[in-house]
Amino acid sequence: PIRSLIKASSPAVKPAVVKRPSFREKQFQAREDAILSVVNRILSTKGYDLMTMDEVAAEVGIAKPSLYKHFDSKEMLAATAMTRLLDRALLQINAQAVEQPALDSLKAVLRWALTAHLEGNMPLLPSTRSTIRQALINHAPYVERLIQLTDAIGQWIQQARKEGQICKSVPDELVMFTLFARACDPTLQFLRETGQYTNAQIVELMVQVCFEGFT
């Protein structure tokens, strides 16, 4: 009944007309994608504090004023790149089968994050003193996706605990922050530099140590 009342009182909605982007709009979007790819790589290697707008513009191959047509500040640029990262993480989370054990879902998402790190696509986490932290907090799209991400991972952690896969004495926050930290762990690079392991082997070793320890 309530749904019927809402439907009856709502004005008829005309189907939206999908406007095809113009050539200029496609160019603008392609340039923006290139900018964010460069930013993602710089954040993965140097971090936010050492990144400069001059460096981004030079690597993309555009003038600095052109860069500011897309992003009016370094903070907005980094916040947009981090938001895209969370979008990719949420795609991985949503790809996990509902009937899959929670611990397996956590492992699968960690594998994705570790692989992204080894491929140079995982930005370094901002430190507690980094100036990007406030910019991220003020960027609504980032906060919205971060809440979705932490809610999903938090539910898996609680379910895995109920299933006896995670120690009851370990707080949920510690488990979650540990998973986040593993995605940016320099151990990945150290293992790769030995030349003894493939990327796939490194990922599995890290997952094993994270969830099973050294025993």
For the regions a language model picked out, list residue spans one by one.
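Basic, helix-initiating cap at the start of DNA-binding domains
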Residues: P1-K46, L50-E59, M76
